[in-house]
From Swiss-Prot:
Gene (name only): eutC
UniProt catalytic activity: ethanolamine = acetaldehyde + NH4(+)
Protein's UniProt keywords contain Oxidoreductase: no
Name used for this protein in its record: Ethanolamine ammonia-lyase small subunit
Species this chain originates from: Rhodococcus erythropolis (Arthrobacter picolinophilus)
Keyword terms: Bacterial microcompartment, Cobalamin, Cobalt, Lyase
């Protein structure tokens, strides 16, 4: 085999298997290879579809009911259409009608919100909720869950106040990107009330196994944050997640072959 016939090694191939990020795209003249251009267009289309796809609240409610913490109530924000939801974030933070929610004296309240990716909630909502209930259920009382459509994170404050819970945990579809269109974010607010800001919350993002954070891993982080928030008396910027340091100390770290 001559030097000109030597095989071309794909340096990026092994690295590409470890991430969904768009790395090592290559070149074809002054542009990208056709394969990479088509991959980009497909990812963009998937992100657009995830944003505009409506939540199948009936199917999700049936799945959530099977978790065993009570039949979920379905509520909506003040948004009338999906396009209005994208144009008016403020309306997504305001409830339309919360009269169906019954107040309780429970400690934890789960709100499953479609957010910017209803697909994420359909793909991961039930399994993530089940993992959270398993992690928290032995220590804390849990109210029947609420499903919210056309919802922003702050809508959870209104819902949690109506639920009468001490800690609100919002599971919401995150804004799709060009590598992930089905990621769930978890927002924890201790002593929720209308008017809370993002500084009063803790967020665990990128929940979408197998590529992203796993359900059980996320549940362990949430358990630590809930315990810390109750000890501290508040959530937000003063409450730190130490689970990563604990994982390193215990030897539970990611290694690449």
């Amino acid at each position: 085999m001559t030097e000109d016939q030597a095989p071309i090694l794909d340096f990026w191939g092994p690295l590409r298997k470890t991430t969904q990020s768009r790395i090592g795209l290559g070149r074809a003249g002054d542009s990208l290879p056709t394969k990479r251009v088509l991959e980009f267009k497909a990812a963009h289309a998937a992100a657009r579809d995830a944003v505009h796809e409506p939540l199948d609240s009936e199917t999700l409610a049936s799945r959530v009911d099977g978790v065993g913490i009570g039949a979920p109530v379905v509520v909506a924000s003040s948004v009338s259409t999906r396009s209005e939801y994208l144009r008016r974030p403020d309306l997504g933070r305001q409830p339309a009608d919360l009269s169906a929610i019954k107040s309780s004296d429970k400690e934890i309240g789960f709100i499953l919100a479609d957010g910017l990716s209803p697909r994420a909630l359909m793909d991961h909502g039930e399994q993530l909720l089940s993992a959270l209930v398993t992690a928290l259920g032995e220590r804390y009382s849990i109210a029947p869950p609420v499903i919210a459509t056309n919802a922003r994170v702050a809508l959870g404050d209104h819902i949690a106040a109506a639920m009468g819970v001490q800690t609100a945990i919002v599971l919401i579809g995150e804004r799709p990107g060009l590598s992930v269109a089905d990621s769930v974010g978890i927002y924890l607010t201790h002593l929720p009330r209308v008017g809370r800001t993002d500084a009063d919350r803790n967020c665990i993002s990128n929940v979408h196994p197998p590529e992203g954070l796993g359900y059980e891993q996320a549940a362990r982080v949430v358990l630590g944050l809930v315990t810390g928030a109750r000890q501290l008396g508040r959530s937000g910027v003063d409450l730190k997640d130490t689970s990563r340091a604990d994982a390193v100390a215990s030897g539970e770290v990611l290694t690449l072959d």
